[in-house]
Amino acid sequence: MDATLEQFINYIDNSARDKLENDDGVPEEADVADTYSQFYTAFAGIFPVSKQCDKDDIVRRLVEKYCSELTIKKKLGFEFKDEDSHPWLSEAEDSIEWFYWNRYRRYLVRDKKWAPAAVKSIDRDSRNILDLMANPLECGSFTRRGLVVASVQSGKTANYIGLISRAADAGYRIIIVMAGVHNVLRNQTQARLEDGFTGFNIENSTVEPVGVGKGSQARRPIACTSREADFSTERAKALRCIQPTQTNEPFLFVVKKNSKSLQQVIEWLDASNSQDQPLLLIDDEADNASINGKYKLEKRENEPTKINGQIRNLLNLFNKACYVGYTATPFANVLIDPSVDSDEYGKDLFPSNFIYTLEESSDYFGAKKVFGDYDEPTHKHLRFIDDADDVLPAKHKSSFEPFMLPLSLKAAIRTFVLATTIKTLRFGTNFHSTMMVNVSPYTL
């Protein structure tokens, strides 16, 4: 697509989405069409390329896409909380400037073209989770521990970026995201947070606006890590010129669950006298590496695993600290002994204050939709293949190599290519299409 034409269409789409998102209720298709038509007319005078366009065709395509998104539904998450939880946000939010949250919301609507229901669910859920945390500006000290549970690949990262944005607006000043145990996952999470929260990418000593930063850089957080590197002694030296006590903007760390990385963060925060700054610690995949694997019921005061102890020490550095774990498999987390409280490490990471479950959207395609559940099994989406036994026997050695592809697999590949082509023609190229072929346990 011509760059000018693409810009013209994006202006129409973004402006229409902004208006429709701010209207109350679910719009009728006729109202959606009128809105898109009005913005087409408004921008046509600015873009000469419009003279070469078919207005009806462009408006129809945009309206079809937007209305298809309106069919996606998502319920509000469900919360379990302790008796000491006291809602605080309703009373405080009139004094909060939602700069980071509004910027992130605008990014989801305009740039990511998220369905209205998906954006509204992140809006509501992130607000509810923040309300379960403590008011960072309240007098005195607090420590809160919570857990957010969601299905695999259902939007956990997008949700905690929304929570981080809201928390930064509310007054949390130190934000740490522990993103897995491998560099690949940490780098991916860093990139997502740059797009959705910081708005810039530091690479090769240059600062490039990305994501939310392309729309507004009136304010920006202090990025303590980059896509190139985890927190290190070199990065700590570079941050000497600015301390958390010298700015009202939040500091963001995206680190691996690695004892060396965590120790360097702990030492830098301890040296920077940050103990009075409110801390939000996000533990992504909270059931991985964070659990104290050395725990024994008969020895509750035993030495914890290295990473578990460091996470607890990190929380203990601050007078105001909130730990929020995110996971799709919470079994280990809810089985943590809630009574553990050692002199050296403090309480363990049991989510003693709240658990919040994120609901799946109606278009989420997961294991339950494929297989059903125990009471209502389903094979609606399964196709049983019976032409592959001669090509790839069920029992085979790891060295086995098939001599040809089954006709069913060839048909499936052709179908995937055709379906992807149709989707591209209808909606453009901003969609991922994936096909996984896994016919042997040795090739997973």
Description of each model-found segment:
Residues 20-141, 183, 187-248, 254-276, ...:
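Low-complexity, highly charged intrinsically disordered N-terminal segments
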